[in-house]
Amino acid sequence: MALRNAGESVWHLLIFKSIWKESIRNEFIRKESIGKNLSGKTGGDIMPAIYAHDRFGAKVSELVNGQLKDTIHAHYTQFQIGLQGPDIFFFYRPWSKNKVNQYGTHLHGISAYPFFKHALLVVRKKGRGSKEYAYLMGFICHFILDSECHPYVEKMIGETGVQHLEIEEEFEKMLLRMDGKDPISYPNADLVPTDEETVEAIFPFYHKGMTPGIVEQSLKDLKLVKRLFRQPTAAGQAVINTAMKALGQYGKMKGLMNQRTDNPLCKETNEGLIQRFDDSVEIAVRMIESFDESLTSGKPLEERFDRTFE
């Protein structure tokens, strides 16, 4: 047990170091790039978190109709991981900066329109009843929720001084409690599939250098990170928090783990985010239907797709 804990602590430190460096890099790029795209930001923050996206997609799936609903239900595993969007690549070998996790950051900061134009080609080839289309509909949900919530989060960072990850973490805890789940022990890692069928559904949507192996490793690493930062005991949380404090990154990084103590400064952000969460459900349904109309009729994609995730 001691050896296992020591090994996990090494993983924690490596991941802290990588995310810390990446957060500094993204902040520098963000400041340098104001006005260069629709949002003035380049991406890299992941908000809301994995459970929020999963919960959001479940609500959207209840409201779509006809073959779209049938496709989602037939391939729910692929739809479910689509709800995490390009964030899966951010976790690829997270102990070091590499082309894959930088690609995930890049996708967040550019217009999603080219991605969705390419997605039309993929789904036309695979079919409206395919696992690929189920994945894509989940991806649309991720895109909508991110792009509806991020501007508010950035605003509230400035007003409250609470960092992005902590706002995300506090919102995640609120949603879990609303659903009758324990936010400290909930196994988010179980929401991440790594099976071959899911991998095959994902990789055709990305650039030519993407391979099934990269997708599979990204999913495995995401699952690992979510497992490492699930610490249901006070002692386990204390070890991780001590490591973050030792690196001088507790304020920025503590939101990687659902903390046992709530931050009262996030009461307002939780209220603002749940309102945007609820309002975004109908938007996501409409955009899935709009994409499907473009798919079947050949009409251009709706302008709403021409936004970043930020």
Predicted segments with their positions:
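N-terminal polybasic/positive-inside topogenic patches
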Residues: 7-8
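N-terminal leader/auxiliary helical segments
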Residues: 14, 23, 28, 33-136, ...
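Aromatic-lined, polymer-binding surfaces characteristic
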Residues: 141
